[in-house]
Amino acid sequence: MGTPREYEVVLTAEEDGGYSVSVPALPGCTSQGETRDEALAMIREAIEAYIESLVAHGDPIPGPIEIERVTVTA
């Protein structure tokens, strides 16, 4: 078992149902699910596979990034 890591994810409710989820710190690491819980379970698997691929290729594992919320008037 590897080192525990935490990543921020972006969970989006889709218009046609279900959820999509992505990991800003891991470009291209995305998944989806019918429910919020399923989408989160699927992204955990996707993150693990993504990191395993990086390790297999000798690439560095990105750390978490900082996410800030901003307010705009539009």
Task: Give a label for each model feature.
Residues 2-3, 9, 13-15, 33:
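Short, positively charged
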Residues 22, 40-41:
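Short, surface-exposed helix/turn micro-motifs that flank interaction/cofactor sites
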Residues 27-37:
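A short, exposed loop/beta-hairpin motif centered on an aromatic-Gly-Thr core
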Residues 1-8, 41-74:
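Short, charged, surface-exposed hinge/linker loops at domain edges
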Residues 11-26:
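Short aromatic-glycine-(Arg/Gly/Cys) micro-motifs in beta-strand/loop hairpins
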